[in-house]
Swiss-Prot record:
Its main location: cytoplasm. It comes from Homo sapiens (Human). There is a cross-link at residue 496 (Isoglutamyl lysine isopeptide (Gln-Lys) (interchain with K-? in other proteins)). A lipid is attached at residues 79, 118, 133 (Omega-hydroxyceramide glutamate ester). Residues 92-115, 159-178, 262-271, 292-304, 314-328, 341-360, 384-393, 415-424, 431-444, 479-488, 501-535 have a biased composition (Basic and acidic residues). GO terms for biological process: isopeptide cross-linking via N6-(L-isoglutamyl)-L-lysine; keratinization; keratinocyte differentiation; peptide cross-linking; response to UV-B. Residues 153-542 are annotated as: 39 X 10 AA approximate tandem repeats of [LP]-[EKG]-[LHVYQEK]-[PLSQE]-[EQDV]-[QHEKRGA]-Q-[EMVQLP]-[GKLE]-[QHVNLD]. Residues 179-261, 361-383, 445-462 have a biased composition (Low complexity). Part of the insoluble cornified cell envelope (CE) of stratified squamous epithelia. This is Involucrin.
């Protein structure tokens, strides 16, 4: 009986799944179904009602009777568990497919946001690492600076300790017995006085020589430990060891003196090499001044300038006298430069003095070295004199600036002189043009006088027709046209007077006096030609009367007007020749 009861129970979930598959939910109502709670299957008693009709009635009765005997809770649990799992899986799958189909943009956005977050995290990590590295470097630098400051602060304290040490040694030197005991040198100390091989190698290298002028590493170590030196002073045996070291340092001092001699020789050679460069600069400056003097000489050869320009020329001549003063100043500059070289040499000596003082603080020097130190201190008094010379140098530099300003003023004066010359040339041209205008007016007056009035001629209108027949020959007509052209050329049009461009061109042509002389000669020739042409014109304008064929007419002389007396033709020509020279205003 148990087997018969279990069979219908196992079939019920399969049947319920088939029913769910046959009726799929619509797409639009998917969201509503997600919101609503999932429908649970009916209880076990109603399940056989949904079964098809083909099931026989006997089995239904058996099934109903069997199910009634089971508890309701077990039936619900057995039906709910597999159904809920399957339904949840289906809903998740449908929901994911729907999101993929409708929201591809959201997926892209999500991917981008994820990538951005990852990149931001990486950048933040890198920034943190860099900040840590920078902090570490800053801490190291601060520590180094602190160490340097401490060392610098320790130096004056060490120097004070050395001074105390010197005072103690001087007190010891006052006692002759102690000095004699300390100055006795054993054979080992004499062996140490000899130059070691390392010092000989240092003499060969100039770079190492300069390094030896500075404090050696051993001395720096001694400076850092003043307390140990004070302890050494108390012990006589340790003082003897220090004396041995002092003898070694005396050997080093001798070497340093040799090195100083070599350095002086090198500095002297460098000073000699620097001198030709300065001489080249002076030569260039002198060449420029010579060019300016030549330019001034050329300007003086030109025509005399007005009174204002003469005053400017005098000022320029005064400025020309200044180059001599400049040459003297240049000589002073050279002397000062030599003194600067001496200053540098003294500064080097001061550095050596400081080096020797440090050595004195460590190991008391003998009396000969003390005398040398006094001599060097006397030499230190020279820098005051050199400071005065430096003040003179500054004064000379200021004078050089003033000279440059004067040179600029000379250039401006030259430009003004050129402008004045240009204006004078324009004035001369204007005067020349006015003279030409006066000549033209005078010619027009003469032409008006030469024209014979109709009353004086007294010829009838018939004579005019005869004059037309008796035209001048072709040569005379060509001469008349040539005269008219020359008159037109001599006339000054109004446009020429108002146009400065034409005047500027004329000024360029009239810059040289030789060209002006040639132009004056050319104008004189033109005036002579004009005189000849006017005489020819006067001759051609005299009336020539010829009677027509078959007619004889009495030609009456022209009656003079009131107050006029007729003169023969010769007298009239003489009058014309007398009136020719133009009246200059």
């Amino acid at each position: 009986m148990s087997q018969q009861h279990t069979l219908p129970v196992t079939l019920s979930p399969a049947l319920s799944q088939e029913l769910l598959k046959t009726v799929p939910p619509p797409v639009n109502t998917h969201q509503e179904q997600m919101k609503q709670p999932t429908p649970l299957p009916p209880p076990c008693q109603k399940v056989p009602v949904e079964l098809p009709v083909e099931v026989p009635s006997k089995q239904e009765e058996k099934h109903m009777t069997a199910v009634k005997g089971l508890p309701e809770q077990e039936c619900e649990q057995q039906q709910k568990e597999p159904q809920e799992q399957e339904l949840q899986q289906q809903h998740w799958e449908q929901h994911e497919e729907y999101q993929k189909a409708e929201n591809p943009e959201q997926q892209l956005k999500q991917e981008k946001t994820q990538r951005d977050q990852q990149l931001n995290k990486q950048l933040e990590e890198e920034k943190k690492l860099l900040d840590q590295q920078l902090d570490q470097e800053l801490v190291k630098r601060d520590e180094q600076l602190g160490m340097k400051k401490e060392q610098l602060l320790e130096l004056p304290e060490q120097q004070e300790g050395h001074l105390k040490h010197l005072e103690q040694q001087e007190g010891q030197l006052k006692h002759p017995e102690q000095q004699e005991g300390q100055l006795e040198l054993p054979e080992q100390q004499e062996g140490q006085l000899e130059l070691p091989e390392q010092q000989e190698g240092q003499l060969e290298l100039p770079e190492q020589q300069e390094g030896q002028l500075e404090l050696p590493e051993q001395q720096e170590g001694q400076l850092e430990l003043p307390e140990q030196q004070e302890g050494q002073l108390e012990l006589p045996q340790q003082q003897e060891g220090q004396l041995e070291l002092s003898e070694q340092q005396e050997g080093q001092l001798e070497l340093s003196e040799q090195q100083e001699g070599q350095l002086k020789h090198l500095e002297h050679q460098e000073g000699q090499l620097e001198v030709p460069e300065e001489q080249m600069g002076q030569l260039k400056y002198l060449e420029q001044q010579e060019g300016q003097l030549k330019h001034l000489d050329q300007q003086e050869k030109q025509p005399e300038l007005p009174e204002q320009q003469m005053g400017q020329l005098k000022h320029l001549e005064q400025q020309e006298g200044q180059p001599k003063h400049l040459e003297q100043q240049e000589g002073q500059l050279e002397q000062l430069e030599e003194q600067e070289g001496q200053l540098k040499h003294l500064e080097q000596q001061e550095g050596q003095l400081e080096h020797l003082e440090h050595q004195e603080g460590q190991l008391g020097l003998p009396e000969q070295q003390v005398l040398q130190l006094k001599q060097l201190e006397k030499q230190q008094g020279q820098p005051k004199h050199l400071e005065e010379e430096e003040g003179q140098l500054k004064h000379l530099v200021q004078q050089e600036g003033q000279l440059k300003h004067l040179v600029q003023q000379e250039g401006q004066l030259e430009q003004q002189e050129r402008q004045v010359e240009h204006l004078e040339q324009q004035v001369g041209q204007l005067k020349h043009l006015e003279e030409q205008e006066g000549q033209l007016k005078h010619l027009e007056q003469q032409q008006g006088q030469l024209e014979v009035p109709e009353q004086q001629v007294g010829q009838p209108k018939n004579l005019e027709q005869e004059e037309k027949q008796l035209e001048l020959p072709e040569q005379q007509e060509g001469q008349v046209k040539h005269l008219e052209k020359q008159e037109a050329q001599l006339e000054l049009p109004e446009q020429q007077v108002g146009q400065p461009k034409h005047l500027e061109q004329q000024e360029k042509h009239l810059e040289h006096p030789e060209q002006q002389d040639g132009q004056l000669k050319h104008l004189e020739q033109q005036e002579g030609q004009l005189k000849d042409l006017e005489q020819q014109k006067g001759q051609l304008e005299q009336p020539v009367f010829a009677p027509a064929p078959g007619q004889v007419q009495d030609i009456q002389p022209a009656l003079p007007t009131k107050g006029e007396v007729l003169l023969p033709v010769e007298h009239q020509q003489q009058k014309q020749e007398v009136q020719w020279p133009p009246k200059h205003k």
